[in-house]
């Protein structure tokens, strides 16, 4: 527990030697004291984030992991300018042991980043974001204690949302405008040799 922020971490077994969890969080609370200062009565500044992880050992050769991250930052100056952004990530990973020298990881990852600007003086706000889906398959092969080969496939689908601009009052001169979404796919094969 700190003066302007605190963090919490909990971890432990759900089922002994099979399933475990981790939960962590962090948050600031300085904004709760800002109203005590007369000149900054309408200002805000805070953040929070949460981390979660669940692991389950299916058998001697297979373990699955599910994890997530959620975070947000907010900065508001007397309702004149408001900035808020956050990210959400979910990750599923399957670890498979082929032998004591070869193992693989199959991962599916979802990420969503959003950003909001509210221009109080200009009476409009702007919301934008980036979403991506990532599928990757990695293998590691230990030839001996000194030599390791890594190889795999990776593909990412992107959705870029340049934003929605909209008036916040009836008096605003800004017109509603939805900017066109953009899409992209990035795929790769990689290999490396570590000695």
Where are each of the predicted segments found?
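Face-selective signature of the C-terminal outer-membrane beta-barrel domain
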Residues: 55-72, 84-195
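Predominantly transmembrane beta-strands of Gram-negative outer membrane beta-barrel pores used
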Residues: 1-42, 46-57, 65-69
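Short amphipathic alpha-helical leader/targeting segments
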Residues: 24, 80, 165-166
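Short glycine-enriched, charge-decorated loop/helix-capping segments at active-site entrances
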Residues: 37-41, 80-81, 122-125
């Amino acid at each position: 527990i700190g003066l302007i922020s605190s963090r919490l971490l909990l971890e432990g077994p759900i089922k002994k030697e099979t399933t475990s969890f981790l939960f962590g969080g962090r948050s600031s609370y300085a904004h709760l004291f800002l109203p005590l200062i007369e000149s900054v009565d309408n200002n805000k500044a805070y953040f929070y984030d949460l981390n979660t992880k669940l692991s389950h050992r299916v058998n001697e050769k297979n373990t699955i992991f599910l994890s997530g991250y959620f975070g947000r930052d907010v900065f508001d100056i007397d309702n004149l300018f408001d900035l808020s952004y956050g990210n959400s990530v979910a990750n599923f990973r399957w670890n498979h042991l082929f032998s004591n020298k070869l193992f693989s990881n199959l991962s599916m990852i979802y990420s969503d980043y959003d950003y909001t600007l509210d221009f109080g003086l200009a009476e409009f706000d702007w919301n934008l974001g980036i979403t991506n889906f990532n599928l990757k398959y990695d293998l590691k092969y230990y030839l001996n204690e000194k030599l390791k080969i890594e190889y795999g496939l990776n593909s990412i689908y992107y959705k870029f949302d340049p934003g929605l601009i909209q008036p916040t009052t009836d008096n605003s001169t800004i017109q509603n405008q939805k900017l066109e979404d953009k899409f992209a796919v990035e795929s790769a094969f990689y290999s490396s040799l570590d000695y």
